[in-house]
A protein has these predicted regions:
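Intrinsic disorder
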Residues: 1-113
């Protein structure tokens, strides 16, 4: 045992269970919403590459999908368009949905007082 052995990674590829359950969640979510589009978010220093599904009303969900290839395959499997956020940006309806939810939460808090 070397001095730095405890810092080396052991084992094979990362477990697929998380990616599979994320893909299943995205497929279920897309099936239960109308007008769904996928937006690929780039990897950052904090997060892995993710895909955001946005419905016609702006409701959205985000999950990891196993890289850009996985995101594109998900789009093909679900028969939905796939966009790159770095090129297109987020859709306005997504921002509008977040703003509506923020206002609703604020009103709810005020009613509770």
């Amino acid at each position: 045992m070397g001095l730095f052995d405890r810092f080396t990674r052991r084992g094979g590829a990362r477990p697929r269970a998380g990616v599979d359950s994320d893909a299943r969640h995205l497929a279920d979510w897309a099936a239960s919403h109308r007008g769904v589009e996928a937006y690929i978010e780039p990897e950052t220093t904090v997060t892995e590459l993710t895909v955001v599904l946005v419905a016609y009303d702006g409701e959205w969900t985000r999950r990891k999908v196993g890289g850009e290839r996985g995101a594109r395959k998900l789009g093909q499997d679900l028969k939905i368009p796939v966009y790159d956020v770095r090129k297109t940006g987020y859709p306005q309806r997504m921002r509008d949905y977040d703003n509506r939810r923020r206002i609703e939460r604020k009103r709810e808090r005020q009613r509770e007082l």
